[in-house]
């Protein structure tokens, strides 16, 4: 559902960034496929147990692997189709926030990607049939039972934190892109910075993280995204917006020419389709017209025949009533 809604949004939003819908479709299609492959590969690489890449029964996807693979695939596709890469990444960043916001609720259904046990009094803490069997939750519950306060061991709903974080980011960047965007690629840089900040904090609460030595992989990647994204954003604001004659892609002549050619071609194809449909309808109506013409011809023929017969009868009757001149003489 998240992928579908993200795709619909990107197709609707692409005109604002000067992108052609067909190009967005091609890039999104490739990015989605490689995104799933990358998410699985990332998980299999960093998981501390042996796992079969193709054994999906036990799940195992990592969002950062999906983002990295999707970004690489999208970049290659943009180069092949000669599409403006920064503008495409801006649309992609907004779409990713939608997909992540909704997709995280799959963790709730599967009772996974949750955080450490709380003190038991957290109003939005969660539990479940899978969660209560977690060794850390069992230990926390024993501690609470020993205290005799009647509380249950609840865990941090990390999926909810990330879903809300992505929702807030999407709303903010959606409106930011309309009025405040000043250079191509800016929205994507803000996306990786915003998501990196939230993920770094949320990952500290999770108990199922992937590790490199003593460090959580997602925290390393998130921290790197924040540093790189923020640095490039500041540099873009300093150099691109102050650069004399800088024009965003959507306002460039190249963009206008591409869009004019594309929509002119679309209009021509629509007119051809309408003409073809009209010809088809005319072809379906033609047999009925022919049948009606034949019926009218048959009616006219029968009427003429009746008139001829009447004339013949009259002429015969006149001959019988006329006296023979030879007899009179």
Question: Model-derived features: where do they sit?
Answer:
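N-terminal leader/transit sequences and adjacent low-complexity N-terminal tails
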Residues: 306-329
């Amino acid at each position: 559902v998240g992928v579908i809604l993200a795709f619909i949004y990107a197709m609707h939003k692409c005109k604002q960034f000067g992108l052609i819908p067909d190009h967005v479709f091609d890039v999104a299609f490739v990015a989605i496929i490689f995104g799933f492959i990358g998410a699985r590969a990332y998980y299999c690489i960093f998981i501390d147990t042996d796992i079969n890449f193709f054994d999906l029964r036990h799940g195992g996807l990592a969002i950062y692997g999906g983002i990295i693979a999707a970004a690489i695939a999208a970049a290659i596709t943009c180069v092949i189709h000669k599409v403006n890469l920064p503008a495409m990444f801006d649309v992609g960043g907004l779409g990713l926030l939608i997909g992540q916001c909704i997709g995280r609720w799959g963790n709730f259904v599967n009772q996974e990607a949750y955080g450490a046990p709380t003190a038991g009094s957290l109003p939005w803490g969660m539990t479940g049939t899978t969660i209560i069997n977690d060794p850390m939750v069992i230990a926390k519950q024993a501690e609470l039972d020993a205290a005799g306060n009647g509380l249950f061991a609840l865990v941090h709903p990390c999926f909810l934190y990330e879903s809300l974080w992505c929702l807030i980011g999407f709303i903010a960047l959606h409106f930011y892109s309309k009025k405040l965007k000043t250079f191509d690629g800016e929205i994507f840089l803000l996306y990786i910075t915003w998501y990196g900040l939230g993920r770094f904090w949320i990952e500290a609460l999770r108990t199922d993280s992937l590790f490199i030595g003593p460090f959580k992989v997602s925290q390393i990647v998130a921290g790197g995204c924040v540093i790189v994204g923020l640095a490039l954003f500041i540099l873009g604001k300093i150099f691109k917006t102050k650069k004399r004659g800088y024009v965003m892609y959507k306002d460039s002549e190249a963009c206008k020419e591409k869009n004019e050619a594309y929509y002119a071609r679309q209009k021509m194809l629509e007119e051809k389709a309408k003409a073809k449909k009209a010809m088809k309808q005319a072809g379906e109506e033609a047999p009925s017209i022919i049948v009606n013409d034949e019926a009218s011809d048959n009616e006219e023929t029968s009427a003429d025949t009746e008139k001829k017969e009447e004339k013949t009868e009259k002429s015969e009757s006149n001959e019988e009533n006329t006296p023979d001149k030879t007899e009179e003489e």
